[in-house]
Amino acid sequence: MPIHLECMSHTPLHGYFDPAPAVVAEVERVQRAARERVDAFDPELVIVFAPDHYNGFFYDVMPQFCIGASATAVGDFGSAAGPLPVARDAALALADAALASDIDVAVSYRMQVDHGCAQALEVLTGRIDRFPVVPVFINSVAPPMASCRRARLLGDAIGRVVARMNRRVLLIGSGGISHEPPVPEIAGADDVVAERLIAGRNPSPASRDARQSSTVAAARAFAAGDSRLHPLNPAWDRRFLELLERGDLTAADGLTNEAITRDAGKSAHEIRTWVAAFGALAASGPYAASIDYYRAIPEWIAGFGAMHARERTLSRR
């Protein structure tokens, strides 16, 4: 059965601190076009590769990869909250396949996902509960982190199962590209911050609001050029998008963690979600991909990109 892929940057700042109206309209046109493609494809299963921003996964036990057998969206930054319609049998089959391929993936029956997953579902399908879904968490902010190569191999293991499914499957990669929002780090953190990174589940509304206000303030400073956050890197972003477009996925294996942080910022590690999604698609053979959008948007502290792809034999359908 056919497989369709959509990869897109996410931003929690949309609606909180926006660029010029013309830029917002531009992004929303790209998002509408992506949703129209998804509507036309009418998936029977959605697999979302997404990061987390210390809303669902913490240093008490920080897996590199985790597949949700049951999941709930926490609703941060105004994103949708509530249970996801997880396709449990499919989730467990994907976990078995990953483990059989020597990818040590965790499984959660109480996964919490944040805007990194929920926003992608809202933008691309209209709501978080429209289609059966399997959420796949990829650690992208909490060192130590697995390599891009491991993310590609995770995608390949999942994709080989997807290729045998008798249903239409939508693959989503949510995150990236160059960006470095003010995500706290456990290295050098004081006791209060460290405890939040270790066991910060289910924060109070006041605590969540304070964190969101801090992020908005950081975005204002970044857009004004008054910030120590890593600058956006459009040239790096375009090189990454182009390697995905031409199907040169093993080139991503050479993107070391140190180089990603140095060249594109500490949260650019979210490119792993794109690498995994494309790895899953490539497991079915050559694909045809399109770079649909790219713009560096400082108000959102994001190199904002979008791509879609299909198996090459189906790309004209």
Swiss-Prot record:
Pathway: Aromatic compound metabolism; 3-phenylpropanoate degradation. It holds the Pfam family LigB. Its cofactor is Fe(2+). Transmembrane segments: none annotated. Belongs to the LigB/MhpB extradiol dioxygenase family. NCBIfam families: PRK13370.1-2, PRK13370.1-4. This is 2,3-dihydroxyphenylpropionate/2,3-dihydroxicinnamic acid 1,2-dioxygenase. It comes from Burkholderia vietnamiensis (strain G4 / LMG 22486). The lineage of its organism: Bacteria, Pseudomonadati, Pseudomonadota, Betaproteobacteria, Burkholderiales.
